[in-house]
A protein has these predicted regions:
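Hydrophobic residue at the +6 position relative to the catalytic HRD Asp in the kinase catalytic loop
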Residues: 159, 163-166
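C-lobe/activation-segment region of protein kinase-like
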Residues: 173-244
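Activation-loop N-terminal segment of eukaryotic-like protein kinases
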Residues: 166-172
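Conserved alphaE helix
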Residues: 137-148
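Juxta-kinase regulatory segment immediately upstream of eukaryotic protein kinase catalytic domains
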Residues: 1-40, 233-237
Length: 244
């Protein structure tokens, strides 16, 4: 535990580092201290801030999660793992099962006896060749990658175009998942597996390619796969645009 300051309550920092990066712990903590003023912005949304920092001869990615609302400050302090902790644990699980994701370095949580505060997830910065959105021609390989997730009892709930990084490796492509805090680990039914493809695209021709590849991999009927995948995709699109 690292004690930060005293105002009303004593704030402390809980942290967990991967064994590989423990020797660089102090350097990483200095980067966290300078997070608000330094670093290269990678993305700044309404909820989270992502920055790139130099650590020795490599670049690392630090994601600062938005401080939760009053109720969730209590929930995350006592009852539920933080998004930072889940991201670290999920990344470790993926790495251990041969699934690509930027290597997890550490997570840190700031809290006091009553409330949860800031939290950070740190990983290697992966310089991707492209994202899923930019490479229609690799749909078949991506379909097989998603099937591999399911065979390892992994349900990536945020399986959407922006959360898959792609690197070219010779004549094939390697896939890396990011934004890992929403995952389940369980046996998946056929419908749950197919539904996991439903957020990836609204283009029928792409769904046809994924359905064809999925049918070849699993031995299931193409018509059965396509009818379910396209139906679930259309249902997701209706719900998505209804919210707008």
């Amino acid at each position: 535990m690292v004690f930060l300051s005293t105002k009303l309550y004593l704030w402390q920092m809980k942290m967990l580092f991967s064994e590989k990066y423990r020797p660089q712990k102090e350097e990483i903590l200095k980067l966290i201290d300078s997070f608000d003023k330094e670093g290269e912005n990678l993305g700044r949304g309404d909820r989270n801030v992502i920055k790139i920092f130099q650590l020795g001869d490599e670049k690392i990615n630090i994601k600062s999660f938005k401080v939760p609302n009053f109720i969730n400050k209590v929930v995350y302090n006592f009852f539920r793992k933080s998004k930072a902790a889940r991201s670290f644990e999920h990344a470790t699980y993926l790495i251990n099962h041969g699934i690509g994701t930027p290597y997890p370095i550490a997570y840190l949580e700031e809290n006091n006896p009553l409330f949860f505060g800031k939290s950070y997830y740190i990983s290697q910065q992966l310089e991707a060749d492209c994202t899923f959105r930019a490479l229609i021609e690799i749909l078949r390989e991506f379909t097989a990658f998603t099937h591999k997730l399911h065979e390892n009892n992994i349900l990536f709930k945020d399986h959407s175009p922006g959360n898959t990084l792609i690197k070219k490796n010779g004549n094939q492509f390697d896939f890396y998942l990011v934004d890992l805090n929403r995952m389940d680990f369980k046996n998946l039914s056929f419908e749950e597996r197919i539904k996991n493809y439903s957020r990836l695209t609204s283009k029928k021709e792409m769904v046809e390619i994924m359905s064809d590849e999925y049918a070849k991999i699993t031995g299931k009927s193409y018509d059965k796969v396509f009818d379910l995948m396209w139906g679930l995709t259309a249902e997701f699109q209706r719900k998505f645009y209804r919210k707008k």
